[in-house]
Amino acid sequence: MIVRSLSDILDGPTHIKSDAFESRRIITARDGVGYSLHDTLIRAGTDQRLEYKNHVESNYVIAGEGEVENLLSGEVFPLSDGTIYTLDNHEPHMIRARTDMRVVCVFTPALTGGETHDKDGSYDG
């Protein structure tokens, strides 16, 4: 059994910060469960172009408002607390945060915890 608190990882090696977001990676590859789980804060007024070429990601919005755009189809979906979206086909997408957002993210395969986005908005496989 793994029991961990958010406070256990704050300001540690799995707490990744950028101008647009903070990713607090609570469960990582070292835990051996096949996925990673992140508590992510997205800053109001930010736009992020992302494309996870090597991972499937599910995102559950628990606070805030914004939108996600599928850059292949042009479809735009509103995001607010209680909304989930999954990037099951590695879609390039744009996240726009209208307010500060808090999102629970699940990645498979699991991230090791220290990854940062490359120039394409992806992580290495």
What are these regions (language model features)?
Residues 40, 59, 85:
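Conserved GNAT-family N-acetyltransferase fold
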Residues 36-53:
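Conserved short histidine dyad/triad with adjacent acidic residue
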Residues 89-114:
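Ligand-binding loop in jelly-roll beta-barrel domains
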Residues 53, 58-81, 91:
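A short beta-strand-loop-beta hairpin characteristic of the jelly-roll/cupin
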Residues 43-45, 81-82, 88-90:
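Tight coil/turn sites that cap or link beta-strands
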Residues 1-35, 49, 115-125:
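A short, N-terminal "cap"/entry segment at the start of jelly-roll beta-barrel domains
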Residues 48-50, 68-69, 87, 92-98:
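Short beta-strand His + acidic residue motifs that chelate non-heme Fe in jelly-roll/DSBH
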Residues 31-32, 73, 100:
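Short strand-connecting beta-turns/loops that link adjacent beta-strands
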